[in-house]
Amino acid sequence: MWGLYLVDVYDNVTCLMQAEGEGYICPILVRKTKTPPSIPDRVKLNEKEATFFIQDIYEGEGLKGIPRGTVKSLRLHAYEYAYVKTRSDHNWHGIQSGWDIKRMLGTVPVEEDGSVIFKAPANTPISIQPLDKDGVAIQWMRSWVTGQPGEVVSCIGCHEDQNQIAIPKRVIASQKAPSALTLPEGGTRSFTFDLEVQPILDRACIACHNGEGKAFDLRGGKKDKLGYGTSYLNLHPYVHRQGGEGDMVVLQPYEYHPNTSELVRLLKKGHHNVKLTDKEWKTLYNWIDYNAPDKGYFNANVLTDLPYKGFDQIKRRKELTDKYANGAGVDWKKEIADYADYLKKQGPITPVMPEKAAPVKEKTLKVKGWPFGADRIKEMLAKEKETRKVVEIAPGVKVNFVRIPAGEFVMGSYRGEPDAYPTAKVKIDKAFWMAELETTNEQFNVVFPDHDSRFVDQQWKDHVVQGYPANKPEQPVIRVSYNDAMEFCRKLSEKTGLKITLPTEAQWEWACRAGSDQDFWYGDMHADFGKKDNLADKTTLLFAVYGVDPQPMAKTNPWYKYYTFLPKEESVDDGNLVQVGGKAYEANPFGLYSMHGNVAEWTRSDYVSYPYNEKTKETSEYKVARGGSYIDRPKYAASHTRKAYYPYQRVFNVGFRMIIED
């Protein structure tokens, strides 16, 4: 006799079932119950699109600190992934570019309250970039989302926490029908350098950059043995971007804004009077936002090995995607070919020689007693009651200040970039205190303990660390906005009773020059800076790395010439790859360290036209950062060099230096 019994903790035994000559293996108790309500299918196989809803794009970590109203639209692109036994490594599409094809799907508008609703292709890996008024990506979505046919996919904001819940509020987008994609001119297609960027170069650049003379060649049509175009190889070194594999944390908004790229800064400052159209600017921004790719296609092989012998991979992928993903297959090769035909129909491009800019009328200004040397500085400081001040901002955390005397000098330079002139006589009416070093991570964390300067990007792939540390206590703080820096100064002022703030452009340049009328306090543009400051030098070659846990490449490595692309002054060795803390270099005659390099520094001045006038009523949406950094060549790190960034922009190589005003 075999039975099934229910036994409780009190040793009560209840027989549920008995049978003679039979046994029960893995019995399951069942009872009659009412069928529960089923969740209706949310997929509508008769549709080819999904609906995407974002309640508030400004919610979440992705757009932290970005003012409401900045996001005007979303740029959508889809990924097309690699094929079997096809060259598709991280450097196939470009140098420090990306792994996959990026197909431009189009843009959709964002409502005033940050909400957005739109339709996009279903069964398609889609990535989203929020754009500002200029068509620049404020943030990069380095993953993707896939909607099923007819599904409504929603999120709260930009990179919101997975535990965050939606805010119970009515938004503009929820009261509207979903927006349709505004397709790119010429249709959906992969972004390729030859068809997107090269036409800009053909019109605006190759009249000069034609392979003749000193200007590097920007003509299209020439490829090296790896398939990289000559114009691409010559242009991409001047673009700041992350690369195929980078730090996985959410990026700072505008981390790779085009204004952090030398190429864009050069053009914005009027490079030989070259003028781009709005469309060309947006295309250039798009290229940078996509990590500056070259190819944008795969040379997928027809397979020769069993069991797939004879398959055309591109054709076969489309067939299978159409069959199993509700017709979502993509013929990206045809899209590229169709756009090439579209461009041909626009007619040949005529290179435009820029109009010669009006000659600069240099006005020689002289100031009595300037320039001056170290002996004069000693005389000036001898009139001050104190020349050094130490401020303890937290137990054991001190800031050393040096006295900067009052005086008059010629601000700006005709040897500099166009925004550095006309020059002006500027008088610093009152002496002030300036920190001898840039504000450090340790000091900044006194007020903002959660701030992390994180890391400097590492090239190549297969990283085992996030990059080169930038968050050591003694290193200068970076990725702080002008607003952050001013708030830091404000809170320290409240705490210490001192008037701590940022310098004006005039105060900064006066302090940096320390009596010099040259490009640097130690000489002209060609002076050896090895012991003076941390700039883009011979050590910049060490950014070219290779292998798992990438280490500096050997010169014999075939990739060496491709990855030593960062502009640099190889004749000088300053001994450091990235920013460093402490007094690693010589101080200028005022006792200030690293004024020209290490990291650039915020000032409290608006980025307005010269000649400099402290009383000007002209304003700007940008603030000025002064000096250069470990990644800048001397020509972009002089005492008169100006860089313009949004006051809420946290820049990868910009920190700040405090002053105290009496």
Question: Would you name each region that the model predicts?
Answer:
Residues 1-113, 119, 138-154, 165:
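Sequence signature of WD/YWTD-type beta-propeller architectures
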Residues 21, 29-34, 43, 66-71, ...:
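Aromatic- and Gly/Pro-enriched helix-to-coil junctions and flexible linker segments
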Residues 67-69, 91-93, 231-235, 253, ...:
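Short, polar loop/linker segments at the starts of domains and inter-domain junctions
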Residues 40, 86-87, 129-131, 140-141, ...:
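Short, solvent-exposed loop/turn and secondary-structure capping segments
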Residues 369-403:
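GGW-centered surface loops in extracellular recognition modules
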